[in-house]
Amino acid sequence: MNFENLLIELGTEELPPKSLRKLAESFLANFTEELTKADLAFSSAVWYAAPRRLAINVTELALAQADKIVEKRGPAVSSAFDAEGKPTKAAEGWARGNGITVEQAERLVTDKGEWLVHNAKVEGVETKSLIAAMAQRALDKLPIPKPMRWGNNKTQFIRPVHTATILLGSELIEGELLGIKSARTVRGHRFMGLKQFELAHADHYLADLKEKGKVIADYESRKALIKADAEKAAAKIGGTADIEDSLLEEVASLVEWPVVLTASFEEKFLSVPSEALVYTMKGDQKYFPVFDDAGKLLPNFIFVANIESKDPAQIISGNEKVVRPRLADAEFFFNTDKKHTLESRLPSLETVLFQQQLGTLKDKVNRISALAAFIAEQTGANAVDAARAGLLSKTDLMTNMVMEFTDTQGTMGMHYARLDGETEAVAVAMEEQYKPKFSGDTVPSAGVSCAVALADKLDTLVGIFGIGQAPKGAADPFALRRAAIGVLRIIVENKLPLDLVTLIAKAQELHGTHLSNVNASDEVLEFLMARFRAWYQDKGIGVDVILAVLARRPTRPADFDSRINAVSHFRSLEASGALAAANKRVSNILAKVEGALPTTIDASLLTEAAEQALAAKLNELQPQLAPLFANADYQQALTLLAGLRESVDQFFEDVMVMADDEALKNNRLALLNNLREQFLHVADISLLQ
């Protein structure tokens, strides 16, 4: 079979930078799926993307589908011939339709009888006749929420399309993509190199674009180049660039020919909290801030131009002029905000509605304050600081700085709290109340911060469920799933001795009587348990392990986590499989017992050696297990229980549980019930697979 390399490029107007990677990856995934469906073999496939193009390169693509043998089954032999052995009309019609005679047909014997068959050879279709349609289908399936039309073209895409190129080796493949006829024309950089040129071969794409068109089409290469040059530029001025990957991705999606430059701003702006300056540099201008070895912001920034200028100083000056007003705004807001304490802003919270049925932000901070103090008392944190931090927690939302730079909420609250003379615990809690903000973010570790963060999230969860607005499907306008995971992570990762039922009840009490959903507390608990399952599954914990623990309904997250870890460890032990099966057998036996289960074991009724041995082993272990259960040392407890395997196996081998003698039967049921209860102190081991 012959092979060639394939290049498909779509030339467009500037594509949305935050969508560029997803578009390119989806285009590749959709197209390779088409190749697989069409039975077209290929070696590998990669995507390329730049602001004004999406491209795919497939190496060693088969030039045609492989020939196939297709079995075409005809009538049963019993109905294909008459009594004289002559072909029936049905058989002749089938044979004629397949271009053969009845005599040329083969026979196929199955368990349902004997049939006429024809194994027809179907020649594979040439790749070049399939490519354009497959590429169009791949484009049609791209995740584009708001497609647009342009000119007189009825076709829709995320941005106007100007060129389409499909090359199989050196051959131009005829066809259209999004209404644009395939041609060799590829567009270069807007301001450098050739505006457009003819591409002779699929293999020349990257090199020709770079040399002739001044475009680095390989997204990953462009991204790596920006990162390396930015790091070098920062090192030259004695600093380290803050190169967050999401910003690096966005910048790489904005430029075709990256040129890294260093600029500066006036040192007077460093009197403003660095987070506000960084916010405007990164968020508004797409600049990389620079920090010294001590983590202090330097009066410099690194930016990426999309052109090689003969006068880079002019570009640098232009960017400095652009950022200065934004930094001046931050300075003005900071100096203005400092004139008022956070406490003085409390009355203004009454003007901001949190939710129609749940009141204003002032109502919310009052609830947070009380709940945070309640939590702090249980965890040993400073309840006075927790109450104070809870009360002030949303006041920075009323500052000029946060209104303008919304992502600085909490952080600016911390700075303003310090300026107001609040305790450090209160100040830190102002910032950490929102943690974790995203998957992989850290959780607060300070006691007061944990109390306020938990109180805020629980107040929202209980309140929103209380008015019957639980998340439905993918919709989650109040980010309750994130809040729930936050609650669980804060408690688990800090090993806090908190019970969800108690916390939910307290939060519900603080909401008063305006919650209409009488089942809110149960629904919130179920919601948190469901998040527990999802969280542990994401961490690679087996579903059976999670279900085994969930069966015991532990409502203390730290305790839940200890059980998960213990059962995960237990499952790795050699004895776990046999003991899980034994527990399942015990559960099935006990489930059939009518009425209350017997619990008292009479040693005098232990007549069989195997039941005597099991009872003795349980009696030996129970004094050791009791303190382990009390201290939640579940892993050690299950390790000890794993030692019961031989005794349990022997018991089921030698002992008839459901004996005719009622007293013997009940005694053995009591023994099995006792055995099961030891495991149930941790989890329902019978659910392990």
From Swiss-Prot:
Record flagged with keyword Ribosomal protein: no
Localization of this protein: Cytoplasm
Gene Ontology cellular component list: cytosol
Keywords: Aminoacyl-tRNA synthetase, ATP-binding, Cytoplasm, Ligase, Nucleotide-binding, Protein biosynthesis
Catalytic reaction list: tRNA(Gly) + glycine + ATP = glycyl-tRNA(Gly) + AMP + diphosphate
GO biological process: arginyl-tRNA aminoacylation; glycyl-tRNA aminoacylation
EC number: 6.1.1.14
UniProt cross-references to PANTHER family, sorted A to Z: GLYCINE--TRNA LIGASE, CHLOROPLASTIC_MITOCHONDRIAL 2, GLYCYL-TRNA SYNTHETASE
Family the UniProt entry places it in: Belongs to the class-II aminoacyl-tRNA synthetase family.
Protein name in UniProt: Glycine--tRNA ligase beta subunit
Organism expressing this protein natively: Shewanella sp. (strain W3-18-1)
GN (gene name): glyS
